[in-house]
């Protein structure tokens, strides 16, 4: 039983709901049910419980924050919606995500204790219900107060938390105590769990009070050393309660919806119908009974025609989806998410395409950019960071809309192929897995697939929770496998290796004692200056010298707190002293690359924008790579400016500071830009700052070895920029002497090019233009003579009559010429089958005959290849006679 003094003192009764069997607390003796959906209907739509003058979300949020500030809570600035400090999820789904796992595990103290926050959060688990249910959102603000109770420090727990909730709703918002029900439940999320109260008013859950004291491990609850108060007050839910509008969207997005309806010519829906529909939707699960069945049941309850209800709902649903999804997408893009096919970008693209799909199905025609821009103007007061990213948001949305339109053009062809494939495997229609594949591979929404399939006489059932399934599959990050170089059990008992490479990155040699040798090639020392691979920087190489021998170090890896040296040759015996000598030239080059990487990514951000985040990096010699999130290939001018900025930072000889800082202190000072290189799993983090405190050029949490100043880099030269994936651009670059060697090689090649073109290095461009002009003229003449030759050859072909077709076999090594001959010959004679041989390559052209039976026959004699209906290409290494015999069999 979960009880609180305020409830007992106020006369609350504990009852059990006969429907859901949950226990709940109420002041009403006549209350039978728990007060939650679906056990009871909403009772506030059209009849809010109070007449409180709360005119905006802004005001409600501020009243909540001030309420808890007056009660000793420190107000904390909201965190980003992208959880860059976590290695398990992409997006923040609740305020407690801000403090998981570091604070909740006890590894790091909270930024304040107790604290209050209003955290924008994103959950896509019910994305299919958005716009339909009247209450579901993908983006919402979780207002919350948190307290962290340690064994030696008590802050507050169940009694105080429940009393705060009681006072906020009764005294701050004026809701009578009899309206408030406290329902007992169990909460679990993010690896933690605890008992909770769900706070309910007239059928609507407006807050959850979680008393977190468990960690979930392998399906079991393990007691935490901390007892954490984790509350969540739904900003939008409470505002809806106070307004009593038909749907949550009308309360939260009212002004935007009014303008959108006016712009698009969509009539305002009947408030009474929408309100009743929300009430009934709240009491049923469309995923269980089916969406279409839900519409019919609701229409029957309201007393209207089902078809009419769908016609009313469809445009409103599209606008509700637009309002919710566009705010969520704007939060994501403003926080650096680029729509793409992976990670958080996948989720952003999913939301944009759901908007476009719903608008299309509702018959609403308008540029999405214009609609979202209208919404951004509404959001700029509460979310200035979103307004600051307006240009980027609109550019990305426009790009996504253009891509989507191209995708729809391909729908008939793609769906036909999918249906053909389904028939080949004996299926009458497309399965949910087929729909997922069509979405992930081609971007086709299942509703569009179903419409296209219907024109081909096939009914396709679209799961009502299709997008929720997709979101769930892409919501979590893949765990990186831990090092398996050496079994942990073989070294875990050893003391932590002293890391000399951090104490002095310029140390070239050192003395150490051999603690253990594993499997004859893995050496553990008590201390080492050999850097262990990490953060995209390779491990050092070198040699371990000892009395009577030496072993070559070919790799260095970290296994937990132990550093393991991989050696070739006879390893040193355990217990002896060794002298480690690092390949300094290689290490120093890698230090230049690593510090250069930090300089380069900051330069890229300054030119391309703050949405740039590192998507991967590998420091190596002679070249390194840096992958960043960006939606298009940078222009040559942008690349040149990036390179100029980077080398300006090098020439400025900025100092490089490395400092160990408490995690909270570092995050408070520098923000989450610290995690450009990824999550750092530690209570204290190693911060690398380039430039002075007054004006740092770049700051990152990093475990690599770095230079003392940027001047040591010498030069940063970008060698290549390419798109390696949707939303990811790769920079290949080099530094120092390797950059000089690269530039010298370019100079050498430039000189050779000038010589070949008949000019000098000073006028090589003009010389190449002249050469290109002559080449174009030669190409034009070749095409002219090739066409003449093709006509002549086509006229003189010797063809053999085989059945109704004519068979001709010729030898031509030039593929372009072969195509011209084929076009000319098959254009003259539709019954011609022309086979062109060139080396072991074989091409088959027909004037109209289906090439498939021919290919099938040729495969029996060793041909490998395929093609379209009238053309096939592949390889054949057999003799000509066997080939011709197979052709005759196929055509006769």
UniProtKB/Swiss-Prot annotation:
One record GO biological process: alanyl-tRNA aminoacylation
Domain of life the protein comes from: Archaea
Keywords assigned by UniProt, alphabetized: Aminoacyl-tRNA synthetase, ATP-binding, Cytoplasm, Ligase, Metal-binding, Nucleotide-binding, Protein biosynthesis, RNA-binding, tRNA-binding, Zinc
InterPro entries: aa-tRNA-synth_II/BPL/LPL, Ala-tRNA-lgiase_IIc, Ala-tRNA-ligase_IIc_anticod-bd, Ala-tRNA-synth_IIc_core, Ala-tRNA-synth_IIc_N, Ala-tRNA_lgiase_arc, Ala-tRNA_ligase, Thr/Ala-tRNA-synth_IIc_edit
Catalytic reactions of this protein: tRNA(Ala) + L-alanine + ATP = L-alanyl-tRNA(Ala) + AMP + diphosphate
Cofactor: Zn(2+)
Binding site for Zn(2+): 594, 598, 702, 706
EC number: 6.1.1.7
Cofactor: record remark: Binds 1 zinc ion per subunit.
GO molecular function: alanine-tRNA ligase activity; aminoacyl-tRNA deacylase activity; ATP binding; tRNA binding; zinc ion binding
GO CC annotation, single: cytoplasm
Subcellular location: Cytoplasm
Pfam family, one: tRNA_SAD
Annotated domain remarks: Consists of three domains; the N-terminal catalytic domain, the editing domain and the C-terminal C-Ala domain. The editing domain removes incorrectly charged amino acids, while the C-Ala domain, along with tRNA(Ala), serves as a bridge to cooperatively bring together the editing and aminoacylation centers thus stimulating deacylation of misacylated tRNAs.
Function: Catalyzes the attachment of alanine to tRNA(Ala) in a two-step reaction: alanine is first activated by ATP to form Ala-AMP and then transferred to the acceptor end of tRNA(Ala). Also edits incorrectly charged Ser-tRNA(Ala) and Gly-tRNA(Ala) via its editing domain.
Family: Belongs to the class-II aminoacyl-tRNA synthetase family.
Name of the protein this chain belongs to: Alanine--tRNA ligase
Organism: Pyrobaculum arsenaticum (strain DSM 13514 / JCM 11321 / PZ6)
Name of the encoding gene: alaS
